[in-house]
Curated annotation (Swiss-Prot):
This is Na(+)/H(+) antiporter NhaA 1. One of its GO terms (molecular function) is sodium:proton antiporter activity. The gene is nhaA1. Belongs to the NhaA Na(+)/H(+) (TC 2.A.33) antiporter family. Keywords: Antiport, Cell inner membrane, Cell membrane, Ion transport, Membrane, Sodium, Sodium transport, Transmembrane, Transmembrane helix, Transport. It comes from Pseudoalteromonas atlantica (strain T6c / ATCC BAA-1087).
Length: 472
């Protein structure tokens, strides 16, 4: 699509003076780096407030109760619980859309192409978990519950760093890191479901299964309207929440039922859009705005309907959720969960096996696991490096994969529920490990000067298959 130029805009005189500023502001919010910056600012704000005279207010906000009631039905939870078990379901739903897209038509479709990413992800999960477990065994028994913390990669942070690096990072690095993060997150979701679920209520689980079956039936029968999946998704979330399985699993499961086929074929789109366009050009009166031309407005609405019927729900819904999740939900999650009071004597934190285990696993575990498994996969002939990627880039990517902020905080809150001291130590370990991994990875990309031939690509794709430009 051609970029909208100033000459093509309908602007009032005052608007023209601010147009450049507004366009820059819009581009900033479209940038992949913006999500990382927003997430980072939320985490910093939480840390600053938690270590200031306002720390009591921060705790009060986190534990403030919010209730929903309808007749005799009522549900009440703290803000912390609503965020972790409620809002984060949308993040996991978006993650599920990404996973489904990548497995069907993306980088994970062909095993030959995806085998390297899968090997890297396996190494990036096994080694961190093993290193953490080895360190945790020297401490209290409860410390071992955090073995899943260093396994996942924070997609928003890692890709945001690559976006800030610009031409210093090859184009294929973002594609590889994105696919790696998705496989990592698949592993983390499995870990949450299998190892961080305690009491299972089979009746609620059965209702959840029936609801999920109903969502798949809607897909098979050709229902495409969001309202059906919204209602079904809310019911699924409620039953999963009552079953004892973590409620965010409902987001992943609901995403798997989202339709991947449009209502209409591309030939129908071309024919009808051409007809609408011809009528629009024929009836357009240059001396009047579209506000004064109701028939033109109706033609534009027809074009929107035609486009909606020819695009897939999995891509359309992913596009709608992408910015709100990245710029609102994840920063709220970071603000509520990242705040932890630093000890008066910071040197004491190095006596904590949880802190040492998490930080070392996120840095050393990711780097060693991903790099070694990638080297074995390539040298054995089982996999091949993507165009434009050298082993130096793989090593740098392995460092960035150690940035595990969002999912790591999430797993820590599950693993150390009821153990506030261990949870605080884990949070500090996550922050320290993520910062160290980000610094090392960024430095390595800046140092790598060897350029590998990179075959041109028509377009890249980001979350849920959305077109991604160089500005993203």
């Amino acid at each position: 699509m051609n970029q909208l130029q100033d000459k093509d805009r309908e602007l009032a005189p005052l608007e023209r003076k601010f147009n450049h500023f507004i366009c820059s502001f819009e581009q900033f919010f479209k940038s992949q780096a913006t999500a990382s910056i927003t997430l980072l600012l939320a985490a910093i704000a939480a840390m600053v407030i938690a270590n200031s005279q306002w720390h009591e207010g921060y705790e009060e906000i986190s534990h403030m109760a919010f209730s929903i009631s309808l007749g005799d039905f009522a549900i009440s939870h703290s803000l912390h619980t609503w965020v972790n078990d409620g809002l984060m379901v949308l993040f996991f739903f978006l993650l599920g859309l990404e996973i489904k897209y990548e497995c069907l038509v993306g980088d994970l479709k062909d095993f030959r192409d995806s085998s390297l990413v899968i090997a890297m992800a396996i190494g990036g999960m096994l080694l961190p978990a093993g290193i953490y477990a080895g360190v945790a065994l020297t401490g209290v028994d409860e410390a071992l519950r955090g073995w899943g913390i260093p396994m996942a990669t924070d997609t928003a942070f890692a890709l945001g760093i690559l976006a800030l690096l610009g031409s210093k990072a090859p184009r294929s690095a973002a594609v590889t890191l994105s696919a790696l993060a998705i496989v990592d997150d698949m592993g983390a979701v499995a870990v949450i479901g299998l190892f961080y679920t305690e009491n299972i209520h089979l009746t609620s689980l059965m209702y959840a299964g029936l609801t999920l079956g109903g969502l798949f039936a809607l897909n098979v029968l050709g229902f495409r309207r969001p309202i059906f999946y919204l209602v079904g998704g809310i019911l699924l979330w409620w039953f999963v929440l009552q079953s004892g399985v973590h409620a965010t699993a409902a987001g992943i499961l609901a995403a798997l039922a989202v339709p991947t086929k449009p209502y209409a074929q591309s030939t129908w789109f071309a024919t009808n859009m051409r007809s609408v366009l011809n009528r629009f050009e024929k009836n357009d009166r240059k001396d009047k705005s579209i506000l004064e031309q109701q028939d033109q407005h109706e033609l534009v609405e027809q074009a929107q309907d035609i486009a909606a019927m020819t695009t897939t729900p999995i891509q359309r819904w992913g596009h709608v959720l992408n910015r709100p999740v990245s710029l609102i939900i994840l920063p709220i999650f970071a603000f509520i969960n990242a705040g932890v009071a630093l000890p008066d004597d910071l040197s004491k934190i190095f006596d904590s096996v949880v802190f040492i285990g998490v930080a070392s696993a996120m840095v050393l575990g990711k780097v060693i696991g991903i790099s070694v498994f990638a080297w074995i996969a390539v040298k054995s002939g089982f996999s091949r490096l993507p165009n434009g990627l050298a082993f130096g880039h793989v090593f740098a990517l392995a460092c960035l994969a150690g940035v595990g902020f969002t999912m790591s905080l999430f797993i820590a809150s599950l693993g150390f529920a009821g153990h506030p001291e261990l949870l605080a130590q884990a949070k500090l370990g996550i922050l320290a490990g993520s910062v160290i991994a980000a610094i090392i990875g960024t430095t390595l990309f800046l140092m790598i000067k060897h350029k590998v031939h990179e075959e041109p690509k028509d377009e890249r794709h980001n979350k849920a298959g959305l077109p991604q430009t160089d500005q993203e």
